[in-house]
Amino acid sequence: MSTRVYFEEYGDPQVLKVGTEKLAEPGDGLVRVEFRAVSVNPADWKLVAGHLKKWVPLDFPAVPGSEAAGVVTAVGPAFEGFAVGDEVIWNGLLGGYRTEAVVPADQLTPLPAGVDFEQAACIPVAGGTAYSALKQLNLGAGDTVLIHGAAGGVGSAAVQIAQAFGARVVGTASQANQEYLRELGAEPVTYGPGLADRVRGVADEAGTVMAVLDTVGTEDSLAATAELLQGNGRAVTTVPGEQSAAAGLAAVQQLEGRVAEVGTLAAEGQITFTISHRMPLIEAADALDICRMGHGRGKIMLLP
């Protein structure tokens, strides 16, 4: 029997329930995976709250969770892609808050050598989104990039990946996370009035930022981006909407192969994900409460 965390109606995280289910043997093209680590993302609590129902219509009961890492326990008939005992990363649309799941094989990526399950479970969403965004920005050696929300899961991954690309990073975060950004190698700037001027003050002699990744989508971040770029730079956002589009920010487009690419960076030691909380899977509701508060560092991990 597999344990799952699910919800039967939209609401706050406390609508989540814990139950068990019997999994069928995997059919053609399917693989059963025992999850060892499940990563929490802001999209999880937004899914439960109903904020995403326009884009992700659900049939209840529904199970949140889009990234995890674990071990293959069974494969479908005549399947040659993975074998029992293989360590893998899973990335799907939903269904990850489980101890074990039957998933399409094309949602799996081999676990890179030397990368543990918790680190691997952070790769698809935080790492993959950051990687896709920076590639979309065509970021390269010598560029200066501004990352809004640089202490969060996607932001902190982007700080490290940008440096692996040879770029210089200016990152916005709360006062409490300024030293953390320095430890990651970014030049930190606090939120609040005068943000664009503070960024100019640390960017370079000319005060030039030509690329922006916005992971927060606040009025302050959008205004600062518009003031800094003045229509001449490149900007992408992980929180697209009318306001960000009006400010000239494009939505991040996820790249094929991003999980494997970030996995390679992790195996090389060029990116390490900060785990802010480790909690049992059955405490997923509390984990989502923490996640939706924001201003955290890194990732929340559920341990099945």
Features from the language model and the residues they span:
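NAD(P)H dinucleotide-binding glycine-rich loop of Rossmann-like/cofactor-binding domains
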Residues: 74, 87-149
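Conserved beta-strand positions in the Rossmann-like core of class I SAM-dependent methyltransferases
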Residues: 73, 170-172, 236
